Amino acid sequence: MNKWDERFINLAEFIGEWSSCYQDGRHVGAVIVKDKRVLATGYNGAPSGVVSCKERGECLRKKLNIPSGTRQETCYAVHAEQNAICQAAKMGFCVDGATIYVTHQPCTICTKMIINAGIKKVVYKHGYPDEFSLVLLKDAGVELVKYE
């Protein structure tokens, strides 16, 4: 790892603090970078105009007893990686060939978006219990690096 990796993973952690997720430890940040330039950032939170779990004062998933890593569609939040990719698209930035720095290993759904967006490298700090996402990244030739 070099000083740029450290800067961008630290930025992802800072962005993750903006998360509107109700649960502690679920604050995730993402930064998409190309040629040492930040293209877009994202954090996990409710879509624009939708009241977040933090504002509601409860976690929908916890209320419905949904285990972590399952039924991800039953959540108000959009994942950090998804938000970053959407922001890049909204602003007209091409992420093909870019690197995404994420506080946590991407889930399978985010992994599919990362692959289809053309992102070629994923740098993450914390693991996530989703082995299939690792298989997909390997199959697609996306470099995966755990920041130590």
Describe each PLM feature range:
Residues 1-148:
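Zinc-dependent deaminase catalytic domain
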